[in-house]
Amino acid sequence: MEALNTNVDLAGLEGRSVLVTGGASGIGLATAKAWAAAGAYVTLADIQPIEKGEKIASDLSHNGQHVNYTFCDVTSWESQLEAFRSAVKFSPRQTLDIVATFAGTAFAPGNEVDHVLFAGEPSLDAELPAPNTKNIEVNLTGVYYSSWLALYFFRLKPSDSSEPGDKSLILVSSIGGYMDSPKASTYPASKFGVRGLFRSTRARTIDIGVRCNLLAPWFVDTPLIAPVKNAMKARGIEMSKVLAFATMEDCVQAASFCAVNKELHGRALAIQPEGTFDLKDDVEDGWAGDQLRPIMKRRREAGFDA
């Protein structure tokens, strides 16, 4: 299985209007910086405190780049709607060209069965609090809202009457959307959900001139995985010693590959420590099974235990 060459010329991003959810931290911020450096008009839509987000945007803008920050809680439809409006208004052509859905929340440990057993013996009189579904609210509902709004605003006609140009929707799932994970339930459920959204939506987006691709990163050393690192450390395990990370650079390159490659549509890209691979998540290639087996074999040989 050969890694893809995801090196692309980012010159095609100049003047393009971009919205990145989760754009003020982690992979989202790294991607946004690369795209802004290439001349794109980038809106960072993030739940980071307004002062922090605006400082990031200001620092980048002082370098001659075009960066806009808007506070955005992706679980709120109204908040996302305002973020998308902000991105369109920030664009010189009053339009939107690329959306990448990097906003996400950390892996919530615990299988559903574990949580049910923790609730104690069943009783009709028990006061049962609702389970924590934040992973699903942020990682799936949030992505669905972003995808919906992207497809809506992509259809705006440019204010200067020019051609709309290429449109790219980049859905961010995880390799956790492709493998069993008995140690958790809500996180893989959310990431499998994004995969399902991708597989249904890609069949139609091309009808309205939108390319749709998916990113499925392996673990990347960002603040988002801090809870997992801490949980492993509490068990006496140093995460970096038993788990090879995918690189931030490979994630940014894969996102950029999706953003500017006008021939790329309907592909799911696994970002691994060894590089980026087309999972071939389609009926012709066994819904990624043939690609996933060697990937997971390498991870288990490297010490990963799902």
Swiss-Prot record:
Molecular function via GO: 5'-hydroxyaverantin dehydrogenase activity
Positions that bind NADP(+): S25, I27, Q48, K52, D73, Y187, K191, V220, T222
InterPro entries, sorted: NAD(P)-bd_dom_sf, Sc_DH/Rdtase_CS, SDR_fam
Active-site residues, as the UniProt record annotates them: S173 (proton donor), Y187 (proton acceptor), K191 (lowers pka of active site tyr)
NADP recorded as keyword: yes
Pfam families on file: adh_short
Domain of life: Eukaryota
UniProt cross-references to PROSITE patterns, sorted A to Z: ADH_SHORT
Top EC category: oxidoreductase
Subcellular localization(s) per the UniProt record: Cytoplasm, Cytosol
Gene induction: Expression is positively regulated by the dothistromin-specific transcription factors aflR and aflJ.
Record EC number: 1.1.1.352
Catalytic activity: (1'S,5'S)-5'-hydroxyaverantin + NAD(+) = (S)-5'-oxoaverantin + NADH + H(+); (1'S,5'R)-5'-hydroxyaverantin + NAD(+) = (S)-5'-oxoaverantin + NADH + 2 H(+)
Single GO cellular component term: cytosol
Keywords: Cytoplasm, NADP, Oxidoreductase
Keyword presence, NADP: yes
Role: 5'-hydroxyaverantin dehydrogenase; part of the fragmented gene cluster that mediates the biosynthesis of dothistromin (DOTH), a polyketide toxin very similar in structure to the aflatoxin precursor, versicolorin B. The first step of the pathway is the conversion of acetate to norsolorinic acid (NOR) and requires the fatty acid synthase subunits hexA and hexB, as well as the polyketide synthase pksA. PksA combines a hexanoyl starter unit and 7 malonyl-CoA extender units to synthesize the precursor NOR.
UniProt record similarity statement: Belongs to the short-chain dehydrogenases/reductases (SDR) family.
Subunit (UniProt): Homodimer.
Protein name (Swiss-Prot/TrEMBL): 5'-hydroxyaverantin dehydrogenase
Gene: adhA
